[in-house]
Amino acid sequence: TVQELRHVSQFHRRDDLRMHAYSALDLAVGVLNEFMIVEKTLYDPSQGWGNPLSYSGISPLDPTVKWSISLIDESGKVPISSIQEKDLVSFFAIMRADGSFVDEDDGQPFFDSMMDWQDADEDERDEGAEDDFYEDLDSPYFTPGRKIENFEEFRMIKGFAFDEDDPRESGIFYNENGSETIHMKNFRDCFSFFHEGPVNINTAPAYLIKFFCG
């Protein structure tokens, strides 16, 4: 029947789209490998690898399909696992000030909460939060006692999401509506969970460069 044909065809279409997605991925990897072979390094998208489709001149054989490839260069970000305490405290203090006078002490609560979230003990830092704090929430949960694995995890950590009971000392990453703030965007742009080497200053965001320059 026509309905049966429609039902079967939707899965064929899904498989076709998956094939096109993998083709675009192979193309992007191929372009990056070519630049690595020829130039030995990837230091800036302006080398030509930033737009694999334009560089390769290849398009889908199916005219009804359009490819779009977006590359995010993680090398221009700071490895989140290696930044020093004083730098991260200062980073949070600048965000907390939101353009007004910066008090370095204002960044400490966010750093302490972040560290307590990751460590395996129950010893609460001076301005941090351990399981006792999270167990008293309306929807209680526990700290994982491991490294933070993604940016969404900050929604769960004291101070980063908006807290109606403590509006002045919370919400630097998520506002009262649960939406990301400009500080969360800047944090995403500046820090990486994947990159582990030195920061590539050629692709570092303006916010990070400004922070480094004081």
Report each predicted region and the residues it spans.
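Compositionally biased linear targeting/interaction segments
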Residues: 1-214
